[in-house]
Amino acid sequence: MIHSLFLINCSGDIFLEKHWKSVVSQSVCDYFFEAQEKAADVENVPPVISTPHHYLISIYRDKLFFVSVIQTEVPPLFVIEFLHRVADTFQDYFGECSEAAIKDNVVIVYELLEEMLDNGFPLATESNILKELIKPPTILRSVVNSITGSSNVGDTLPTGQLSNIPWRRAGVKYTNNEAYFDVVEEIDAIIDKSGSTVFAEIQGVIDACIKLSGMPDLSLSFMNPRLLDDVSFHPCIRFKRWESERVLSFIPPDGNFRLISYRVSSQNLVAIPVYVKHSISFKENSSCGRFDITIGPKQNMGKTIEGITVTVHMPKVVLNMNLTPTQGSYTFDPVTKVLTWDVGKITPQKLPSLKGLVNLQSGAPKPEENPSLNIQFKIQQLAISGLKVNRLDMYGEKYKPFKGVKYVTKAGKFQVRT
């Protein structure tokens, strides 16, 4: 299936390659580089590229491209899912999936890729099994390996490889038994000039950190599970139980993993947490304009909105901006024409604003349209969709674990048109 894998950074350098069958020349990536040059943004590179003799299937993760080379037709989503699993494994092993982390652990990377694919076909992709086959890097283990010349490859076969629950290893023991869940939601929205919502959608995930002894059987229920659309499950979830009762029933993997990802697409269920008052104007035959924006929280949120950043791509005729913020600080890059206002957190009692003059090139025509505002923010202890965990029940073990749920809402692609 997969003949080769190339890892490419944002500069276009191939810093790692792995071949499972015959060696494929790096020149095959020229087709990928051509598509990258044509794309307006790195995220817009086509995930599937057809060449005369190969198919290139790629993903973009953490400022890296994972480009796989295929010689026969296969379901593209199958390959894309595997590439994401590779990136997730690197993240789990090294703490980050970056070029530096991969180069620092290049031996372990090749060992992992050798175990994850057998002659080009996915074999072991569960983190718990891989950690039994190849020990994660530690400072002590690295020192011992350098002295003794040994490797991180385990000397015993994994216990869960042939069981019905390959995602969980046997004999797990903890002094403190804990089960924590993070409900993280990103809101994508487009707001028009009048403040009306043109488009709104919520992308959410539930990440779990499970450190439980033995073989626990968990059931996680929600207050309002019917609002979830397009739910994607970890393989441990019993799908029939979800279909009939809307309850997540599962024997969890050990450690950190993504339990589900979901989408809320009904616009009447998507609450917009912030509003923006704006007045951006450019006069005809004038070398200056006015810029005035105010941002505030919706009254019904009840939570502090923090980490607010407003980014504006100004027209090319703008030379400079002389603005005064009532809160936070701003920067304007005269080369890229990007205005960035770091607001911080806001409260209804004092609404932050940014206003002042915009200097334009003399004799230049008036900009045809006003720029859009791109907003980033974070709200702690709130799921913007209204999703709430009801309870977590455990069966099969007699101890009482520590339980916890944390909610976070973040802005995804949040745009306000002016």
Swiss-Prot record:
Transmembrane segments: none
Cellular component annotations (GO), alphabetically ordered: AP-3 adaptor complex; axon cytoplasm; clathrin adaptor complex; cytoplasmic vesicle; cytoplasmic vesicle membrane; early endosome; Golgi apparatus; lysosomal membrane
Domain MHD: 176-417
Pfam families: Adap_comp_sub, Clat_adaptor_s
Membrane-topology annotation of the record: Peripheral membrane protein
Protein's UniProt keywords contain Membrane: yes
Annotated localization: Golgi apparatus; Cytoplasmic vesicle membrane
Chief localization: Golgi
BP-aspect Gene Ontology terms: anterograde axonal transport; anterograde synaptic vesicle transport; clathrin-coated vesicle cargo loading, AP-3-mediated; endocytosis; intracellular transport; melanosome assembly; platelet dense granule organization; postsynaptic neurotransmitter receptor internalization
Coiled coil spans: none
Keyword Protein transport: yes
GO molecular function: small GTPase binding
Sorted UniProt keywords: Cytoplasmic vesicle, Golgi apparatus, Host-virus interaction, Membrane, Protein transport, Transport
Domain of life where this protein originates: Eukaryota
Family: Belongs to the adaptor complexes medium subunit family.
PANTHER family: AP COMPLEX SUBUNIT MU (PTHR10529)
Its biological purpose: Part of the AP-3 complex, an adaptor-related complex which is not clathrin-associated. The complex is associated with the Golgi region as well as more peripheral structures. It facilitates the budding of vesicles from the Golgi membrane and may be directly involved in trafficking to lysosomes. In concert with the BLOC-1 complex, AP-3 is required to target cargos into vesicles assembled at cell bodies for delivery into neurites and nerve terminals.
Subunit text: Adaptor protein complex 3 (AP-3) is a heterotetramer composed of two large adaptins (delta-type subunit AP3D1 and beta-type subunit AP3B1 or AP3B2), a medium adaptin (mu-type subunit AP3M1 or AP3M2) and a small adaptin (sigma-type subunit APS1 or AP3S2). Interacts with AGAP1. AP-3 associates with the BLOC-1 complex. (Microbial infection) Interacts with human respiratory virus (HRSV) matrix protein; this interaction plays an essential role in trafficking the matrix protein in host cells.
Entry protein name: AP-3 complex subunit mu-1
